[in-house]
Design a protein with these regions (language model features):
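Secreted, disulfide-rich extracellular signaling modules
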Residues: 1-160
Length: 160
């Protein structure tokens, strides 16, 4: 059987990093229309003990995947592998030699939003570190995820 490609329906970056003033967190910022998603962790940006993170959210066409499985276009569960391919966008910052990424299914629906600003975090609305859409907050700030211990979740280390 050949390779079947599924592309994300929507994506967004959310963060709790500090804005340029280093006193206000960007927890209300939205980066759903940016041309890339960012994954980062910054230690001691504002204080010696502060930790700032971002999360890249992706929604894939699960209904299409289920339909393809039912129709026999892809093999039954347990006999097919799915791969998530992400690429590094060219930038002037250094990459970590080693990083650990946790990939988990999101437990609540969310809106992509129209934010573009990934520097000053001036765009708000839709999903953010605090909100999953304009009206509803995440159950847990930073996104609500299914429990990795009871659901499919992946942790992998990347070494350059």
């Amino acid at each position: 059987m050949g390779i079947k490609r599924y592309v994300a329906n929507k994506d967004a970056t959310i963060t709790n990093a500090f804005k340029l003033d280093l006193s206000t967190r960007a927890t209300g910022s939205n980066m759903g229309e940016a041309d890339v998603t960012e994954i980062f962790s910054i230690y001691a940006q504002a204080t010696t003990s502060s930790i700032e993170k971002s999360r890249a959210l992706y929604e894939f066409p699960i209904t299409d995947i289920t339909t393809d499985r039912t129709s026999g276009d892809i093999p039954a569960s347990g006999s097919v592998d799915f791969y998530l391919k992400l690429y590094n966008a060219k930038h002037g910052l250094s990459l970590p030699r080693q990083a650990t990424y946790v990939i988990q299914p999101i437990s609540q629906d969310w809106d992509e939003g129209e934010g573009l600003d990934m520097e000053s975090y001036l765009d708000s609305g839709s999903c953010s570190w605090k909100m999953r859409n304009l009206e509803n907050s995440w159950t847990t700030a930073g996104g609500s995820f299914l429990d990795r211990n009871t659901n499919t979740g992946i942790v992998f280390d990347k070494t350059l």
